[in-house]
Each structure stands twice: as structure tokens, then as C-alpha cells.
Curated annotation (Swiss-Prot):
CC per GO annotation: cytosol; nucleus
Organism encoding this protein: Schizosaccharomyces pombe (strain 972 / ATCC 24843) (Fission yeast)
Protein name per its UniProtKB record: Serine/threonine-protein kinase ppk8
Similarity comment text for this entry: Belongs to the protein kinase superfamily. Ser/Thr protein kinase family.
Pfam families the record matches: Pkinase
EC class of the enzyme, as a word: transferase
Subcellular localization, as worded in the UniProt entry: Cytoplasm; Nucleus
Keyword Methyltransferase tagged: no
Reaction(s) this enzyme catalyzes, per UniProt: L-seryl-[protein] + ATP = O-phospho-L-seryl-[protein] + ADP + H(+); L-threonyl-[protein] + ATP = O-phospho-L-threonyl-[protein] + ADP + H(+)
Length: 513
């Protein structure tokens, strides 16, 4: 007789397999005894074997018993079965002790959870994510998870990117780029280009141009030839409204107004011209998405609000708040008083100082990129050439390289083909903007010794016994600030925050409150 009995055990966990074998004459006897339990899923019974598989759970008071005459030659098998039966009994004892241990642990866990819930409800209003129960963050940078490790770009990366920007592309549809080649000496460096703003010079400089330069000014007249807009890339409808008249255009985009139901302008759409070379489309998309990322992140009263970016019919559009005036037209028509000029200059410095506090340099501060709202407040636009020169929690300043910006406004170090501080370039450009507002003209065409006016400024500045004609022509209260902002050496040039904190600017600030 072979008996496998397990009584008074709760859910025995069998970690071994037990096989009961019999000869043919014993099949009927075994079958009769196992009929009641043959339906159990953890018992596998065949013609000549009964198998209790591993990792099965046996019910309480489970008994398997069968009797039959076992031949002497089967005695070894009987001993084998009895050994397994004893093993199962030992496992049952072990399981019982583990079960009691788990039960006690479960009770302790439930009591701990109830205590935590009571404490949490009483102290923090039932918030399990309270700061009271958070662990203090580690101050060791090595404990930061790897997914939050960021590396700043190397200088070689920016150099290679700048070389790639020199690839020649056709900006106008149908390959009609002759007009741009004549107007913009920085053509084919798009989308980042050094813009030769001789059209601005033609408006501001009052003297008559003669000789070979006369034909150049005739060709660069922006009204002399209209741009052709590719109808396949034009978009007439957006979620913000329908696009209407074109109110402005540049080398790589044009501006269309969006009116409300009363036909009053509420937004403008900056529509970018895609390159005809499809291989450059990826760079085109990446460039303008980067511009949108800069603009949409900035939140300041003197910086334009960029609301959305839309990709439709292979054309990228930026939805921007509508501002009715531009600073260039405002000053050329003679509407700018001395006090208003100082106020607008303070607002310009305030907006640029905000950008610099975030480690961002504009790199293309000029009259065309400064708009005015209904109350004549300054709005800085166009962040296509913005550059991150400082990262949080770092003391180093990333240097920029390459000719970026508009020639009358750029600092002299930009033309030296050496790395330079982009924030110092913004300081220089802001000072040039003030000179244009106050004098109604540019101080020079390009900050290079080949330009007579700039060469005169450098000569007079280096001579301690001579006063600069440019500085002396400015209003008295602004001379000292502009003098330090137009320092030839960008290492000793004053910062935007320094210019903003001068006595002159603080007095102007009081008039705006």
C-alpha cells in the first residue's frame, strides 16, 4: 500500500513532481481510486502514471490513497514513492511556517498603512505626495538620472553648422533670385545672412548719391521690383483666421495680416518661403522651429508674442501678435521727440536685458526688428539669429563666430572672423539704434576702417585729447552711456544691465511709471 496524505495544510506549494507508476494489472484499481480527483487541473493522470506537477497548489485536506498488491520487484518503486511522500510532508511543514510569517507581515503592513493614512489625513489633508514625506534630493551631480544629463554643444559643432549655412539656395520661386543678389550682399548665406541695409541708408542719408553708387541704389529700391510668391506654397486659411494682404517681406519670409470679423487686424502670419532644393528642407524646418522655440519661450512686455507655429501645404507659418507701427517708419517721419526717443531706448534695453538674463543674445538688433504697439511701446521681433551664450549654473560664456546681422548695426569684432561675445554685439547694436533715432542717420555704413566715418571715430576715440564728433552730436545726458556702449574693445564694453542702470536711464524710467 502506498499512501500520500497531506492533512491540515493550507494550500501546499509543491516544489517537486511526484510520479506514481503501476503495471497494467494495477490500472483499474488506480483508476477507481482517482476518479474523484481526475478533474483537478494540477493532476495529470495517464494510463500508467499519476503525475503531480511542480508549482501547483494543493487544496486543504487533500488525500491521495490507493491500495494494491505490489510485487516484490516493485518494492524499490514503493520505497521511491514513500521518500517523495516524506518530502511532500516536509515541504508542507515549511510552507505552514512561511504562511504564518507572511500573514503576520501582512497584518503589520496593513497597520502601518492605516497609521500613515491617519497621519496624512490629519496633517496634510490627505495628500500622499506632500513635501513632508519626500526624501531630500541629493546634492551630488552623480545621483542625477542619466536621462537628465545634457551636454552643451562644442565649438566645433557651431563652426560646422555655420559652414553648412553657406550652402547656396534659391530663396525665390522659379529660381528668380537676381533681385536679392543685387540687394543683399549676404545672399546665399540664408537663412542666416549679413544683411546689407543700403535701402535703409538711402532713406536716412540726405545727401545725393552720384557716380557708380547711383546705379546700385537704383537697383536696391525695394519698390523697383515686386517679389513673386509661389502660389503653390501660399496658405489662405488658418485656425486663427484668413490671411489677407501682405504688409511686409524679407529675404526668407513675408508677413500677411489676419483680420477678425470686423476686418480689424488681430494677428499677423509670418510665412516662410521653403527652399526649392528638397535636400535642404530638413535644415529649413529645423531652423524655423528653433526660431519659434526662442520666441515662444520669451515673456516680456517689450518682446513680441509668438502664439503658434503651423505647418500646412509644405509651408511653415508663425502666428504673431499684431503691432501697427515699426520704429524705422516712425522716426523717418519725424514723429519722435527727444523724451520719446529716450523712453523707447530704455524699453529696448529692458527687453534685451531680459534676454541676456536668460543667456540668449539676439544678434540682429536693428530698426527693422523693433516694432511699436498702439501706445508706442517697443516690441522686439525676429529671433532667427538668436544664440544661447550662457547656460544655467555655468560661469563660462559661449563665443559666437561668423558674420551675422546687418552691416550698419554689427560690432567691429563681427567682421574680424574671430570668436566674439554675442551679448556685447547686442550692446553695440542698441547704441547704433539710439544714434539713428537721435541723429536720423547711420553713424557709418559698415564698422570697418575702410569706412571713412568709422575710421574717423576710431581715430578720435584713441586720441585722449580729441572728442568724438559722433558722441558730441548726441544729446548731453546720453553721451557717457553711448560712449561706453560703443567701445571698440568688446572686453571692456559695458553690459546691457550696466547701461540700463545709469543715471540717465533711471531718470527716463521714472517718466514711464
Amino acid at each position: 500500500m502506498a499512501v500520500i496524505t497531506e492533512e491540515n495544510s493550507n494550500n501546499l506549494f509543491c516544489t517537486d513532481s511526484l510520479e506514481l507508476t503501476s503495471n497494467k494489472q494495477d490500472d483499474q484499481v488506480i483508476s477507481n481510486y482517482l476518479k474523484p480527483v481526475r478533474s483537478y487541473p494540477y493532476i495529470k493522470y495517464s494510463r500508467s502514471s499519476l503525475l503531480l506537477t511542480a508549482s501547483t497548489t494543493l487544496p486543504e485536506n487533500f488525500v491521495i490513497s490507493f491500495t494494491n498488491s505490489i510485487e516484490s520487484e516493485e518494492s524499490d518503486k514503493s520505497d521511491y514513492l514513500l521518500d517523495h511522500a516524506h518530502s511532500l510532508q516536509e515541504l508542507s511543514t515549511t510552507h505552514s511556517s512561511l504562511s504564518s510569517t507572511l500573514t503576520s507581515m501582512s497584518e503589520e503592513s496593513s497597520s502601518t498603512e492605516s497609521k500613515f493614512a491617519t497621519l496624512n489625513d490629519g496633517i496634510n489633508g490627505g495628500n500622499p505626495y506632500s513635501r513632508l514625506y519626500r526624501k531630500n534630493p541629493s546634492s551630488d551631480p552623480n545621483d542625477i538620472p542619466p536621462q537628465f544629463h545634457f551636454k552643451k554643444k562644442s565649438k566645433s559643432f557651431y563652426s560646422s553648422m555655420y559652414d553648412k549655412m553657406k550652402i547656396r539656395i534659391n530663396i525665390l520661386p522659379n529660381g528668380n533670385d537676381n533681385f536679392i543678389k543685387k540687394r543683399n550682399s549676404g545672399f546665399a548665406l540664408a537663412p542666416i545672412a549679413c544683411y546689407n541695409h543700403t535701402s535703409d541708408l538711402r532713406k536716412l542719408l540726405k545727401h545725393k548719391v552720384t557716380g557708380s553708387n547711383a546705379s546700385i541704389f537704383k537697383r536696391i529700391n525695394p519698390r523697383s521690383r515686386k517679389r513673386v510668391v509661389n502660389p503653390e506654397c501660399s496658405v489662405t486659411d488658418t485656425p486663427y483666421g484668413k490671411l489677407n494682404n501682405v504688409i511686409g517681406e524679407g529675404a526668407s519670409s513675408f508677413i500677411r495680416v489676419i483680420n477678425d470679423r470686423n476686418k480689424l487686424p488681430i494677428y499677423v502670419a509670418k510665412v516662410f518661403r521653403p527652399p526649392l532644393d528638397t535636400s535642404l528642407l530638413r535644415r529649413y524646418v529645423r531652423y524655423f522651429i528653433a526660431e519659434y522655440t526662442f520666441a515662444s519661450t520669451l515673456r516680456h512686455p517689450n518682446i513680441i508674442k509668438v502664439l503658434d507655429i503651423i505647418y500646412k501645404r509644405h509651408t511653415i507659418l508663425q502666428i504673431i501678435e499684431y503691432v501697427p507701427y515699426d520704429l524705422f517708419t516712425f522716426i523717418t517721419k519725424g514723429h519722435c521727440s527727444a523724451l520719446k526717443a529716450d523712453q523707447m531706448f530704455f524699453q529696448l534695453l529692458d527687453g534685451v536685458a531680459y534676454m541676456h538674463s536668460l543667456g540668449i543674445a539676439h544678434r540682429d538688433i536693428k530698426l527693422d526688428n523693433i516694432m511699436l504697439d498702439e501706445n508706442l511701446n517697443v516690441k522686439i521681433i525676429d529671433f532667427g539669429t538668436a544664440f544661447v551664450f550662457h547656460y544655467p549654473f555655468e560661469s563660462t560664456t559661449l563665443m559666437s563666430d561668423g558674420v551675422v546681422g546687418s552691416k550698419p548695426y554689427v560690432a567691429p569684432e563681427v567682421l574680424t572672423q574671430k570668436p566674439y561675445d554675442p551679448s556685447a554685439v547686442d550692446v553695440w547694436s542698441c547704441a547704433i539704434v539710439y544714434c539713428c533715432i537721435a541723429l536720423k542717420r547711420f553713424p557709418w555704413k559698415v564698422p570697418h576702417t575702410s569706412d571713412k566715418r568709422f575710421n574717423l571715430y576710431v581715430t578720435q576715440r584713441n586720441d585722449p585729447n580729441t572728442k568724438s564728433q559722433l558722441i558730441e552730436s548726441l544729446p548731453m545726458n546720453s553721451r557717457d552711456t553711448i560712449y561706453h556702449m560703443l567701445d571698440i574693445d568688446f572686453n571692456t564694453r559695458c553690459s546691457i544691465s550696466g547701461a540700463r542702470s545709469t543715471t540717465w536711464m533711471q531718470q527716463v524710467r521714472k517718466t514711464l511709471i
